[in-house]
Every structure is written in C-alpha cells, then in structure tokens.
C-alpha cells in the first residue's frame, strides 16, 4: 500500500490510522462501509498487538473462498516490521491449515508495515467458555485433548522443511536455558533472592538430570503454548492461535500445558481422567500400547519444568 500507516488518536498503540485502514479495507476487501470500527484487544505477553476491525454496514462486503462475508477481522501488529514474507507465524499457519487443522485464515500481509490481516475467530477463548459454562468443563477439555492428539498425529508425521518447527526442539540445552532464565529473572530479579553458588550448583545438577530424562523422549510436533487462552472457541470448534514458537518435543509437553494450566483450575480427578483419555486416543491413533509408567514419569517431570518456566 502506498498510504502511510500513520497512527492517530482513534487507534492507540497502532502503527496505522483511519486513512490507511479505510483505503486498505476498500482496496483489499472491497468494504463499502461508511464507518470502520477498530478496537485494541488484550494480547499475550509478547510485543505483538491485536486489533479487531469491523464495519457496521455489511452491504457489499468481500467474499472469501468459502463465500462467507467478512464482517470483521483481526489485525496482528508485529513488534516491528520484518521484511520477509515467510515469517515463522505465517509458515506454521500455512502448514497447519494444509493439514486441515483449525487455524485462522490469513487474508493479507502488509510486509512494510508488519501488519497481518487474519480471520476473526470470535471473542471466546477456551478459558472464557470454561468459566461461562462450568457444567461443560469435561466435554470442553475432551474436545481440546482430541484436537491435541489430532495435531500431534498429523503434524508429526507430515514433515515439511518449510515449517520452522522441525528445525528446533526441546533438547537439554533449550530446557536448561528456560530453567536458568527462571532463576535469573524470577528468583534473582523479581524475588530479589539470588541463590549462592553452592545452592545454584546443586539445583542445576538436579535440573540437568530432569532435562536429560525429558530430552530422551520421542519427538512430536508441539504447539508450545497449548492452553486455555490460546484456543479460541468459535461456533462450537476450537481454533489454534499463538503457535509461532512451535517446535519438536515430548508428546507430554502440550498435554501438561493444557492440564496444568495456570489460568484454569482443574480437579486432580479430572486431570487423571483426561490423561487416560489422551493415552486411549494416542494408542488408537498410533496402533501401539503406551508405556504408562514411563509416560506418567515424563508427564510429572514435564510439569515441573513447564510450570517453573512459566512463573
């Protein structure tokens, strides 16, 4: 686009303004609405920003391939423009959609401005749905576990050299980096309680052993942040978002992320039931028995590593 994406008072924290948005939506999406509405959305912990763009008048809206009128969409604003069409988010998005896995459609990418125009998958995350309909908690989590097994099965066995996830993994070095990051930024900085050299050495030895055990596991495609805030609940289906850091790792990694979620409390009995359900689906999908003792051990070790990393 030739229109400068200059922000104005109506678009706080955006690198674009009303003129840019009006011209872009008309040229790319054929929107004819007199008034375009833009609201900033609550994002994740990253430097990305999110905006919902909609029009009040839906006459003459653009039709996508499925002939569904696009009445609203999401703009994902990168921390800063990256002059590359194939950023990790887009490569992984294309890969997931090629496997018929639920991920938002990418309509347009303004490379110079670092703005991605994405399908609007609604306002309800799995977390929202769980709190709104607590009576459906078991059914909703079973749905999330089913999607996880489907994602792991399809993505693990469909290796694509263009997908960045296959070029990175949870090895000992990566797992220990996350552990040391927690020590430096949580224990030392946030708690202001730096460990002495001896205590840090002892703790490091314990975690090295734990990380070596985890790293021996068979590698699966992992979302890396598969939890209730990164699953949108859109018209009865769950949709994957925030998957740009996907990598190879133990199958338990995403299951721990889901069932040991810091945003939603799950009763221990339901956790056990869902682990059993996951193992049953996994055995059915792969056609072989799971070593349950080993599986549970890695699940527990992964729970320690994952939750310390997340503090």
Give the label of every model feature segment.
Residues 21, 25-31, 156-168, 173, ...:
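An alpha-helical support segment within catalytic cores of ATP-dependent transferases
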């Amino acid at each position: 686009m030739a229109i400068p994406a200059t922000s104005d008072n109506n678009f706080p924290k955006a690198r674009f303004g009303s003129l840019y948005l009006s011209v872009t939506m008309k040229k790319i999406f054929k929107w004819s609405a007199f008034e375009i509405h833009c609201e900033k959305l609550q994002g994740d912990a990253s430097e990305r920003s999110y905006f919902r763009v909609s029009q009040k008048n839906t006459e003459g809206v653009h039709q996508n391939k499925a002939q569904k009128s696009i009445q609203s969409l999401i703009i994902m604003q990168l921390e800063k423009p990256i002059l590359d069409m194939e950023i990790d988010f887009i490569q992984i998005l294309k890969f997931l959609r090629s496997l018929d896995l639920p991920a938002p459609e990418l309509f347009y990418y303004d490379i110079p401005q670092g703005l991605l125009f994405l399908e609007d998958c609604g306002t309800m995350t799995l977390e929202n749905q769980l709190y709104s309909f607590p009576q459906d908690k078991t059914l909703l989590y079973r749905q999330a576990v089913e999607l996880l097994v489907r994602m792991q099965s399809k993505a693990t066995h469909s290796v694509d050299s263009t997908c960045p996830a296959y070029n990175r993994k949870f090895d000992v070095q990566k797992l220990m980096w996350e552990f040391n990051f927690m020590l430096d930024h949580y224990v030392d900085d946030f708690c202001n309680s730096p460990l002495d050299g001896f205590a840090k050495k002892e703790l490091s030895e314990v975690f090295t052993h734990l990380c070596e055990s985890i790293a021996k596991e068979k590698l699966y495609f992992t979302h890396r942040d598969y939890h209730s805030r990164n699953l949108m609940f859109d018209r009865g289906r769950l949709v994957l978002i925030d998957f740009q850091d996907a990598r190879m790792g133990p199958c338990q990694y995403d299951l721990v992320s889901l069932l040991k979620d810091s945003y939603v409390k799950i009763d221990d009995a339901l956790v056990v039931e869902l682990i059993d359900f996951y193992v049953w689906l996994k055995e059915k999908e792969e056609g072989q028995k799971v070593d349950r003792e080993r599986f549970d051990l890695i699940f527990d070790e992964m729970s320690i590593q994952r939750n310390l990393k997340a503090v």
